[in-house]
């Protein structure tokens, strides 16, 4: 089905003004009044319609990733990975698939500067022959928490105070003082990469662990990585202040202007894979979203390239109404038991139904470009005309049948019902290794950002001591330096 077939007629194809229902408007400058100075009449339908439409132009803002920019292009397979997955769009080198990508900041509101220290969203929608595939990630390979139960609390801590409507450091460091698994993510957020130069010069990661399934049903755990061909570049704190003060939409402008000039952004896609039968061979849990997979023992494998060569035509239609969900996969790519991914599978689609309505997948930007059919009918803002009589399954009057079964390896699950943490937490090792990989100047900038966060007037001595203890367990010298700057005695 062509997702654009039932798109409402554009308002730009009439030579004169009309109402939404098509009636001609002979005066779009003045309201209907009694005489020159009399009251406005309620019967001025065009005025009422115009104001009512204006009053409803805005839809609910995304609870996270509100500020964003989109672009369109294609993904091309460059290396054969057919032995790992039966996904049709990865079937052979040379295969191209249309994509739309949305880059975003995470915590801050829709009109916020793009120079604030914040993770960046990196979401890709592939329009494949077997349906859409949404790879919904960030520019950092790990996350703050490993269990989605804490996601609402985490966002609340980052968001402005419900009392003052201001972002306050004491709220952030207080919340995460209870979650040492966040340390690895903070070695990215408080590092120089915490403020990318723009969207073209940043990495992308699927973050969560997915599963690739081959034609013979073999499963491999997989991590996805996007690497920009123009390299990774960042803004230091003082540079961000200058750039943000000059243009608070600098990253959107850079992306739009680059594509318009023919300087198309490009990323290479790599994967890391682990045999699903070998996931217990490491000192970390491969399903733990707070951990990276060491590239020296699990090397990157090239897959393809993505080129963005077309700007969007309408910001509202192709950015604000663009909707992603990690549950949207294709045969050959499946979920894992990653606890954060499991909660995202529900939450993303749920928030889109809240923002856009139950039929958000009918919107042209979200609809698949392949043929599709089901009995999901009606509902708010259902604008696709359907004339079939049979809206149930099965039926002898409707030849539609089940699709061919695609490979899905059987699994035997056993265990007690319980709420618990994972066995291999190992919260400090990778955070310490990353800190030690910084050069001395970069280490000092990282340290100073923590000093700034922990010297907020509301941060207590207890909270400071906890963070000194955490960073000491990552790296003894880092803990000592932080304690010295804070003028407190280290616990270790």
Curated annotation (Swiss-Prot):
Give the PROSITE patterns listed for this entry.
CATALASE_1, CATALASE_2, CATALASE_3
- The answer to whether keyword Heme applies is yes
Record protein name field? Catalase isozyme 1
Gene this chain is encoded by = CAT1
* Binding locations of heme: 348
Assembly and partners are described as: Homotetramer.
Give its E.C. classification number: 1.11.1.6
Keyword check for Heme, yes or no: yes
Species source reads Hordeum vulgare
What cofactor does this one take? heme
């Amino acid at each position: 089905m062509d997702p654009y077939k039932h798109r409402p007629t554009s308002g730009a194809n009439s030579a004169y003004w009309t109402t939404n229902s098509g009636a001609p408007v002979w005066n779009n400058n003045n309201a209907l009044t009694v005489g020159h100075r009399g009251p406005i009449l309620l019967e001025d339908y065009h005025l009422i319609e115009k104001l009512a439409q204006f009053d409803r132009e805005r839809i609910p803002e995304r609870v996270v990733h509100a500020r964003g920019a989109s672009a369109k292009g294609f993904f091309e397979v460059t290396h054969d990975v057919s032995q790992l997955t039966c996904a049709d769009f990865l079937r052979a080198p040379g295969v191209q698939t249309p994509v739309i990508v949305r880059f975003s900041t995470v915590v801050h509101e829709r009109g916020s500067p793009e120079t604030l220290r914040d993770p960046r969203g990196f979401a890709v929608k592939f329009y494949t022959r077997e349906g859409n595939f949404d790879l919904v990630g960030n520019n950092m390979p790990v996350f703050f928490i490993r269990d989605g139960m804490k996601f609402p609390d985490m966002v609340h801590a980052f968001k402005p105070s419900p009392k003052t409507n201001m972002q306050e450091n004491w709220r952030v460091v207080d919340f995460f003082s209870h979650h040492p698994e966040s340390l690895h993510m903070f070695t990215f957020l408080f590092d120089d990469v915490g403020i990318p130069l723009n969207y073209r010069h940043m990495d992308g990661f699927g973050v969560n662990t997915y599963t690739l399934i081959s034609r013979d049903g073999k499963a491999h755990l997989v991590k996805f990585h996007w690497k920009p061909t123009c390299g990774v570049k960042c803004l230091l704190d003082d540079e961000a202040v200058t750039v943000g003060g000059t243009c608070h939409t600098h990253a959107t402008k850079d992306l739009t202007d680059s594509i318009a000039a023919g300087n198309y952004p490009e990323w290479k896609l790599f994967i890391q894979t682990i045999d699903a039968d070998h996931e217990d061979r490491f000192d970390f849990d491969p399903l733990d979203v707070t951990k990276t997979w060491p590239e020296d023992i699990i090397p990157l494998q090239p897959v393809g390239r993505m080129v963005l060569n077309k700007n969007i035509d309408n910001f509202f239609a192709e950015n604000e109404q663009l909707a992603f969900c990690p549950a949207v996969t294709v045969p050959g790519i499946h979920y894992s038991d990653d606890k954060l991914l499991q909660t995202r599978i529900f939450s993303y689609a749920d928030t889109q139904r809240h923002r856009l309505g139950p039929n958000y997948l009918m919107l042209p930007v979200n609809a698949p470009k392949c043929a599709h059919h089901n009995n999901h009918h009606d509902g708010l803002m259902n604008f696709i005309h359907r004339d079939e009589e049979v809206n149930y399954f099965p039926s002898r009057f409707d030849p539609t049948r089940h699709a061919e079964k695609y490979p899905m390896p059987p699994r035997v699950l056993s265990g007690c019902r319980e709420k618990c943490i994972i066995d291999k937490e190992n919260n400090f090792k990778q955070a310490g290794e990353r800190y030690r990989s910084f050069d001395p100047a970069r280490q000092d900038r990282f340290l100073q950002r923590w000093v700034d966060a922990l010297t907020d007037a509301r941060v207590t001595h207890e909270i400071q001591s906890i963070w000194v203890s955490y960073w000491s367990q990552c790296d003894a010298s880092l803990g000592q330096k932080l304690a010295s700057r804070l003028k407190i005695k280290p616990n270790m």
